[in-house]
């Protein structure tokens, strides 16, 4: 216990430590007088504690995702089209591109993972029902082989770095492969009035677990930032 707490104030009721017993490990310590005080501490700081663990997990996943580097040439295409950069793995290739709209659909091999990027009006994505209508129509125009299923649709919001991200999740069907899987859409507000950038991720891996793959795509999506990498 002394080893764990030696670098923290004795009266600190809550602290986070890293790499105590193993690398890439995070430990949360709570000091309280009794069970009631501990319960109150967790209640007051629960979201912060969870975020610390989430950030550690995402950091480890991000290091693994980009262990072979970043596809600078493809990231520069994203930058040229949208004025924003996106970190991508070296094996991603362009499936479909339109610099006028602009629109970009990229992917990598089996298990198939796709990422699409396009712009839309912010006003189209302020209301949940309206947002799904516009998304269906925009996918139909940009990626006709992608159909959004009615079986599952979910929306959520969470604060990002200086911006509120709007997230849509669902199930898609892919006509050409006669299969489908989970997808998400991250909606980023830009500095331009009434404009958003939509970064979508799709996993196509029939009969296999997809949670880790979709999470990896989400980590990639969240690397979107203004200007060059």
Task: Describe these PLM feature segments.
Residues 32-34, 40, 44-51, 82-84, ...:
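Contiguous hydrophobic, core-forming segments of folded domains
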Residues 30, 37-64, 92, 196-229:
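Surface-exposed amphipathic alpha-helical segments
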Residues 31-34, 109-111, 119-123, 172-173, ...:
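Short, flexible beta-strand-to-coil junctions
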Residues 1-29, 140-194, 208-209, 218, ...:
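Signature of long, low-cysteine stretches enriched in small and polar/charged residues
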Residues 55-72, 142-155, 229:
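Short glycine-rich, low-complexity/disordered patches
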Residues 66-96, 222:
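N-terminal "mature-domain start" segment
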Residues 89-142:
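Secretory pathway targeting signatures of secreted, lumenal, and periplasmic proteins
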Residues 50, 54-76, 102-112:
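Charge-rich, low-complexity N-terminal segments
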């Amino acid at each position: 216990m002394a080893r764990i707490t030696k670098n923290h104030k004795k009266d600190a009721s809550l602290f986070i430590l890293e790499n105590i017993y193993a690398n890439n490990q995070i430990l949360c310590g709570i000091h309280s007088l009794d069970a009631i005080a501990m319960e109150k501490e967790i209640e007051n700081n629960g979201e912060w504690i969870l975020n610390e663990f989430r950030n550690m997990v995402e950091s480890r996943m991000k290091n693994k995702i980009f262990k072979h580097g970043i596809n600078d040439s493809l990231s520069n295409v994203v930058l040229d089209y949208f004025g924003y950069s996106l970190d991508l793995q070296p094996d991603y290739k362009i499936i479909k591109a339109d610099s006028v709209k602009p629109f970009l659909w990229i992917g990598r091999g089996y298990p198939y993972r796709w990422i699409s990027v396009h712009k839309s009006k912010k006003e189209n994505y302020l209301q949940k029902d309206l947002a799904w209508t516009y998304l269906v129509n925009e996918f139909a125009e940009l990626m006709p082989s992608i159909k959004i299923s009615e079986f599952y649709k979910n929306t959520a919001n969470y604060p990002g770095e200086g911006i509120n991200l709007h997230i849509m999740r669902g199930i898609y069907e892919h006509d050409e492969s006669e299969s489908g899987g989970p997808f998400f859409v991250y909606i980023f507000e830009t500095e331009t009035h009434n404009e958003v950038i939509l970064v979508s991720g799709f996993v196509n891996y029939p009969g296999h677990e997809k949670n880790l793959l979709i999470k990896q795509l989400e980590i990639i999506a969240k690397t979107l930032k203004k200007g060059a990498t």
